[in-house]
Structures are given as C-alpha cells and as structure tokens.
Amino acid sequence: MESAATAVVPPAAAATTATATDDNLQSSDSSSPADAVNRLIHAFSQRQQHLLDKTVPHVLYRWIACLCVVLIYIVRVYFVEGFYIITYAIGIYLLNLIIAFLSPQEDPEASLTSGGSLPTRRSDEYRPFVRRLPEFKFWLSIIRAFIIGFMMTFFEVFDVPVFWPILLFYWVMLFFLTMRKQIQHMIKYRYVPFSFGKKQYGKKPAPTESSE
C-alpha cells in the first residue's frame, strides 16, 4: 500500500516565515498613513503651484491682491493696538526684499574684480537688467510675509510690549540709509532696475516726409 509523500517543514523555518510575514504586514500598515499624508501634501503643493503659475501674467491683479492683504493686516494691527514687533520684523524683511529686487543678479563689483567689464559708453553692447529677485518672487514673498504676520497676531505670545515710535523711527532711518547706498551703487555702476525709458531694439524709426 502506497503512502502519499508529504513535505515536512521544519518548525524553525515555519516560525521564521510567520515572523517575516507579520513584520511585512506591520510595516505596510505603519507606512500607509505616512504615505497618504505625503501624497496629500504633494497633491496640495502641485495644485498650489498650478494656481500660482496661472497668476504670473496678471501683474496688475496680483499687486492689487497684495495691497488688499497688506490693508487687512494694517486694519488688524490698528484695532488690536499691538503686535508692533511683528510689524517691525515684516518691515525689515520687506527692506531686504526691496534691495534684492533693485539689485542686479550679478554684482558689478564682483565682475570688475574678476576681470570682467561693464559697458560704459553708448556704443557698448546693451545688456538687459536681470534682477537678483524676480518680480513674481518679490510679490509672493510679500504676500507670504503678511499672511504669516496676520496669523501670528492671533497669539498673545507674540505681542511683545514695545514703544512703537522708536521702532518706526529706527526703520525709517534704516530705510533711508539703505536706499541711499543702493542709489549710489546704481550711479556708480550705471544701471537702472526698471525697463521704462530704455532703448527699444528691433524697431525701425518712422519714415519722415521730405519736402521738395
């Protein structure tokens, strides 16, 4: 009488397989919530970036929205009569943004010391002004600064008692000195951070009628 052959699995191997299976199940269960959160954050970031990209050509509307955000923050600080240290910090941050917005991407001093040269005569080649901080990033940084500052005004821990006229006077003096230095830098290296008034290339002058 023939007996059916059965494979016998050692107990140690069976225990190892069961333990590995349990570990895989536990690791998959523990990583699932984290993966879901990461996917949610990634989807939100993509959606936010898509909306921001759509606003790039609408310069006027973007700055109108920025002005509205600034006014909302000012009204909030005016009615609560506090959080002046946050306003001062935003002012210092805005001053740094303005300097970066008005500065060229390549420092002229570094170009001269490294052996480069800038066009100093009218006959030299025209070089367009490239900002260190582009206009869109400048706008976005201002929006984010005031939104974060507005949210911080709902927490009393940030309401540090301070005599606000001193902060205002110090900021005005810092703004004056910084802008004077920036203007001197513009005059020294002969660049203008704005496009209006610059020579337009590629356009032919209108023909003039000759009198016979």
From Swiss-Prot:
Q: Which GO terms describe its cellular component?
A: cytoplasm; intracellular membrane-bounded organelle; membrane
Give the modified residues of type N-acetylmethionine: M1
Could you tell me where this protein is found in the cell?
Membrane
User: What are the entry keywords?
Assistant: Acetylation, Membrane, Transmembrane, Transmembrane helix
Q: Where are the transmembrane segments?
A: 55-75, 82-102, 135-155, 157-177
Which BP terms in the Gene Ontology apply to this protein? Answer: retrograde vesicle-mediated transport, Golgi to endoplasmic reticulum
Membrane-protein topology: Multi-pass membrane protein
Mainly resides where? membrane
PANTHER family from the xrefs? PROTEIN RER1, PROTEIN RER1C
The Swiss-Prot or TrEMBL record describes its family as follows:
Belongs to the RER1 family.
- What does this chain do? Involved in the retrieval of endoplasmic reticulum membrane proteins from the early Golgi compartment.
- Protein name (database record): Protein RER1C
- Which organism's genome codes for this protein? Arabidopsis thaliana (Mouse-ear cress)
- Taxon lineage: Eukaryota, Viridiplantae, Streptophyta, Embryophyta, Tracheophyta
